């Protein structure tokens, strides 16, 4: 037999084997509380409160009562048998209690209970325990001679157990505040190292290393009354660390505002803030992205070559509108390219139609042009690959042609040699200035004058330029200087 709050109660094993005798009368009705100890469902609550009820409640139309014996206050009292413990009702014979005709309960042992008087509706306990009224209320005995039977802590424990029983009888979930008892007086709990003695009770406060300073564990040991053990972990009143909304995301903005979304199952944050705590990946950039980036750069360069640019020196006109560009050989004018090639293939036929004086000059021109054929082909290929160079070159040509005046224009003679009747071949042979004088070449009806606004070497498809003409063709007018001509041909070759 153990003690709870100074009141003995029977163990579970004893009560499980005990058979409760019901009264012979139909009026007696007994409600057995499960083994005198309320055990909550572990699956639903998972919390057990330490302690038990030191008294039972009997529902009966008559004023029935159950009082457990207390042998600690009366050492001469022997413990009764298990078959006669815990409960008694009207009409049940028991060695502890006797029922009088006026329904007042007296004890067979002298000195424990006194009659409540005839017609009394309550049981008056002479020993300083408590009294139960007909309404079910429990009141403390006010016997000043015997003194207080319960301490303040014991009385609060009885009140808590009575409230738990009311919730259970009403089939209502018991609040967690009642299941986990906390001391109501926190004034003496501020210092955990202080041992206090209050009403015969020792209160020991122990701190654990793995708990915060605001958490403390109370161990209350009742020594004077035979003892009750109460264990519980409580937090101080000033520290409210409990999360009132555990289903809510715990991500805050650093101040007082909190995310309103629900957390992911088994997580602390919502879907939006779950990635905040994850480490960021350091993936390398894929090669496909790099290749596409280079391709974009190349296409951008090609697009810039196709843009129409304007220059202020040409009065805001686009380059494509300048007439000098149409005379330049480029990739877009294959006729000029083939015309230059035909000039080399049919040079013999063209020279045969000229007079002897003109043939000598043309042969010198053709000799130098053969050596420059490779450079001419390279120039065409270079212009096909880089069309921007053609545009810049055309801009320079237009600038030179606009800056020149009619007095300084150079006159050139362009010979048009007709080959076969089915194919017309035009070869422009340019004769430029040599020594500041105007060269005049005698010819036949095949030559004609063509005047341009710019230098003749810019419009001619014949390679060589003004340098080849000045070195070779300029000395052809002096027939006596044969050595000079030969040296010019050797230098040009």
From Swiss-Prot:
This protein's UniProt keywords: Activator, Nucleus, Transcription, Transcription regulation
Domain QLQ: residue ranges: 149-184
Return the protein name: Growth-regulating factor 8
- The keyword Lyase is assigned to this record: no
The record's annotation in PROSITE patterns points to: QLQ (PS51666), WRC (PS51667)
* Role played: Transcription activator that plays a role in the regulation of cell expansion in leaf and cotyledons tissues. Component of a network formed by miR396, the GRFs and their interacting factors (GIFs) acting in the regulation of meristem function, at least partially through the control of cell proliferation.
Locate the compositionally biased regions of type Basic residues: 273-283
- Please verify whether the record's keywords include Methyltransferase: no
What the entry lists under InterPro entries is as follows:
Gln-Leu-Gln_QLQ, GRF, WRC_dom
In the record, the note on similarity to other proteins reads: Belongs to the GRF family.
The Gene Ontology terms for molecular function here are: ATP binding
Region Disordered: start-end pairs: 270-302
Where is the chain membrane-spanning? none
High-level lineage: Eukaryota, Viridiplantae, Streptophyta, Embryophyta, Tracheophyta
List where in the cell it is found: Nucleus
The segment(s) forming the WRC domain are: 243-287
Cellular component terms (Gene Ontology) = chloroplast envelope; nucleus
Predominant location: nucleus
């Amino acid at each position: 037999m153990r003690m709870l709050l100074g009141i003995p109660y029977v163990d579970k094993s004893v009560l499980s084997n005990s058979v409760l005798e019901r009264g012979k009368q139909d009026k007696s009705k007994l409600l057995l509380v499960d083994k005198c100890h309320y055990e909550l469902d572990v699956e639903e609550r998972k919390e057990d409160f330490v302690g038990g009820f030191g008294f039972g409640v009997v529902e009966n139309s008559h004023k029935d009562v159950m009082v457990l014996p207390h042998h600690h206050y009366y050492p001469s009292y022997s413990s009764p048998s298990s078959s006669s413990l815990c409960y008694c009702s009207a009409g049940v014979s028991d060695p502890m209690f006797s029922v009088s005709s006026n329904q007042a309960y007296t004890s067979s042992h002298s000195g424990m209970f006194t009659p409540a008087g005839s017609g009394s509706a309550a049981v008056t306990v002479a020993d300083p325990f408590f009294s139960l009224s007909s309404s079910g209320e429990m009141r403390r005995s006010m016997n000043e001679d015997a003194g207080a039977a319960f301490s303040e802590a014991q009385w609060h424990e009885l009140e808590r157990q009575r409230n738990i029983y009311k919730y259970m009888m009403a089939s209502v979930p018991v609040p967690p505040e009642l299941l986990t008892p906390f001391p109501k007086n926190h004034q003496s709990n501020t210092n955990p190292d202080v041992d206090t003695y209050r009403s015969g009770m020792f209160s020991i406060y122990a701190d654990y290393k793995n708990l915060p300073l605001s958490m403390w564990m109370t161990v209350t040991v009742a020594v004077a009354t035979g003892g009750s053990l109460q264990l519980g972990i409580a937090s101080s009143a000033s520290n409210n660390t409990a999360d009132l909304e555990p289903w809510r995301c715990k991500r805050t903005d650093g101040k007082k505002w909190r995310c309103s979304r629900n957390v992911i199952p088994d997580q602390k944050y919502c879907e939006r803030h779950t990635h905040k705590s994850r480490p960021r990946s350091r993936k390398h950039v894929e090669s496909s992205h790099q290749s596409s980036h280079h391709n974009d750069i190349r296409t951008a360069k090609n697009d810039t070559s196709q843009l129409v640019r304007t220059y202020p020196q040409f009065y805001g006109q686009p380059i494509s509108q300048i007439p000098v560009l149409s005379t330049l050989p480029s990739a877009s004018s294959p006729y000029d390219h083939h015309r230059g090639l035909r000039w080399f293939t049919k040079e013999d036929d063209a020279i045969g139609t000229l007079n002897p004086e003109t043939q000598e000059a043309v042969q010198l021109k053709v000799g130098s042009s053969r050596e420059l054929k490779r450079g001419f082909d390279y120039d065409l290929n270079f212009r096909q690959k880089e069309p921007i160079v053609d545009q810049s070159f055309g801009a320079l040509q237009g600038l030179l042609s606009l800056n020149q005046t009619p007095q300084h224009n150079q006159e050139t003679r362009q010979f048009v040699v007709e080959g076969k009747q089915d194919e017309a071949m035009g070869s422009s042979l340019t004769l430029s200035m040599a020594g500041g004088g105007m060269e005049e070449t005698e010819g036949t009806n095949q030559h004609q004058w063509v005047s341009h606004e710019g230098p003749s070497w810019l419009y001619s498809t014949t390679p060589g330029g003004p340098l080849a003409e000045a070195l070779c063709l300029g000395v052809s007018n002096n027939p006596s200087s044969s050595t000079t001509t030969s040296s010019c041909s050797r230098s040009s070759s």
